[in-house]
Regions:
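Conserved NTP-donor binding/palm subdomain of two-metal-ion nucleotidyltransferases/polymerases, i.e.
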Residues: 1-43, 49-166
């Protein structure tokens, strides 16, 4: 099922961020967050959480699903990332949220959560990395994981670099 981002998506992700904040979960959203919660330019929402808080985050997500009468989900795990696929055919709703406990690639942790979290800033009602650290992380991820820099990320890194020097 393919679902376009709707007001239901906006309400769901807003509730998720609000619950994370209310429960004192330290987190931040990676990339493509500028339109959230109203729109989403990416195909998913990447949320990095403090290590050891995944079970609490699971409870939060399941509670939100129940509030929205959504009962189907699937989780795929890759190292410290869990990809949540949450959907409801009757409501024409599907959302993909990646919950990441640490930035790890093939067992190599390239940034500690505490180091990254020291570079977090508020954005609307949720948290994101500042542009400098976002750029550094994007560059490191591409070099380590892909051994090359994708064109779309070249543009983002260039824009962030130019903005930081203005």
């Amino acid at each position: 099922m393919i679902a376009l981002w709707s007001s239901l998506h906006a309400a769901f992700i807003s509730q998720f961020f609000m619950e994370l904040n209310m429960h004192g979960i330290r987190y931040f959203v990676l990339r493509n967050y500028e339109g959230l919660p109203e729109t989403n330019s990416g195909k998913d929402v990447d949320v990095v959480i403090a290590p050891g808080t995944y079970h609490k985050v699971t409870g939060i997500l399941k509670g939100i699903m129940q509030n929205f009468n959504i009962y189907y989900f699937q989780i795929s795990k890759f190292e410290t990332m869990r990809c949540w696929y949450i959907m409801d055919d009757a409501q024409h709703f599907a959302i993909h949220i990646d919950i990441i406990e640490n930035e790890v690639y093939k067992g190599f942790q390239y940034f500690d959560f505490e180091y990254l979290y020291a570079n977090v800033i508020p954005y609307k009602d949720f948290y994101v990395l500042n542009k400098t650290m976002d750029t550094v992380l994007l560059l490191a991820q591409n070099i380590i994981a892909y051994k090359r820099l994708k064109d779309k990320y070249r543009r983002t890194i260039t824009q962030n670099y130019l903005q930081s020097n203005e």
